[in-house]
């Protein structure tokens, strides 16, 4: 994949992104089946990437745009790269705004949104 193909791929609205554009401010139906956990004195979701990482130790995911991801944690490390624009994260209760070209590596069990 060359840089032009990557750029085109990243700008295509996924079905999830189309849903979020039609339902601004609403929590994705994905969360309806996930229980909330009391973790570090917070109500948050636990994400299990067992299926994503079933055959490989590393998974690559294009995160949905146009949405807010609620507080969550997982047993896997996470690397976020801001390809374009800005994104505000809450990491361990601290607001962090990232810009194009920024990289963030989260350790295991770090609550973030």
Task: Identify the function of each model-found stretch.
Residues 88-90, 106, 112-113:
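Short beta-strand His + acidic residue motifs that chelate non-heme Fe in jelly-roll/DSBH
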Residues 1-87, 96:
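Generic protein-terminus/edge-of-domain signal
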Residues 81-83, 102, 110:
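Short, flexible loop/turn elements at secondary-structure junctions
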């Amino acid at each position: 994949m060359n840089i032009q193909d990557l750029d085109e791929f990243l700008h295509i609205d996924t079905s999830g992104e189309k849903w979020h554009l039609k339902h601004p401010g609403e929590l994705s139906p994905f969360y309806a089946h996930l229980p909330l956990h009391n973790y570090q004195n917070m109500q948050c979701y636990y994400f299990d990437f067992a299926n994503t990482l079933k055959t490989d130790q590393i998974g690559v995911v294009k995160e949905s745009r146009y949405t807010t991801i609620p507080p969550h944690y997982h047993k896997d490390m996470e690397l976020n790269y801001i390809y374009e624009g800005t994104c505000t994260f809450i990491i361990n209760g601290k607001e962090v705004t990232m810009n194009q070209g920024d990289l963030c590596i989260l350790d295991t069990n770090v609550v973030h949104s």
